[in-house]
Amino acid sequence: MRSLADFEFNKAPLCEGMILACEAIRRDFPSQDVYDELERLVSLAKEEISQLLPLEEQLEKLIALFYGDWGFKASRGVYRLSDALWLDQVLKNRQGSAVSLGAVLLWVANRLDLPLLPVIFPTQLILRIECPDGEIWLINPFNGESLSEHMLDVWLKGNISPSAELFYEDLDEADNIEVIRKLLDTLKASLMEENQMELALRTSEALLQFNPEDPYEIRDRGLIYAQLDCEHVALNDLSYFVEQCPEDPISEMIRAQINNIAHKHIVLH
């Protein structure tokens, strides 16, 4: 299996990096099935969309296919949030998050030579494409709808701060590795909430391949170990965080957790 640390995410399609990350976490992840389904979608799109059409028309047709005929949509009533992130489940259920739906749409678009790009906007992943006339087209991957600068400004003010302003840098292309790390962060939080602690641990380990000494990720791994009753390793990880980030407001809570684990350890022994 390829190492996440050695893989050049920014030189490969976003979906390929996501598949590699999923493989690192789930031993049963059906990578070949996912690739087969992605290729099937590409073939369907090529049958329906002539590359002789103007770029804008090709993209309009692809969006109509993706959210219309193929039925992809934002996850609604999904029992587990993680199912909106695993690519095999997204392709099976046709429901997903902004990142997972965006990644699938990017795969098909890029195979059609449509220069669609990911953007990590402060509220969610969005997609952008620059048209031949220089106009920038922004797309919401949840539903394929166009996004105006006014709408993005409303999102910022409603979700970040009433005083937040929209800057051009907010619409810059994101590195794939940045998108993958955000996906894994969300996946880890979802798995912890769903009490799928073994998978959450493997997700944390995957994130640590990008930055092995990240105190915040080591803290999260320690909290997961504590849930798995692996007290000794949990103590090591949590203590590392407190040593590295003594001024962090959450350090007091972590110290209390360390004391609880240490006390439990003494009582048991």
From Swiss-Prot:
Pfam families: TPR_9 (PF13371), Transglut_core2 (PF13369). InterPro entries: SirB1_N. Belongs to the UPF0162 family. This is UPF0162 protein YchA. The gene is ychA.
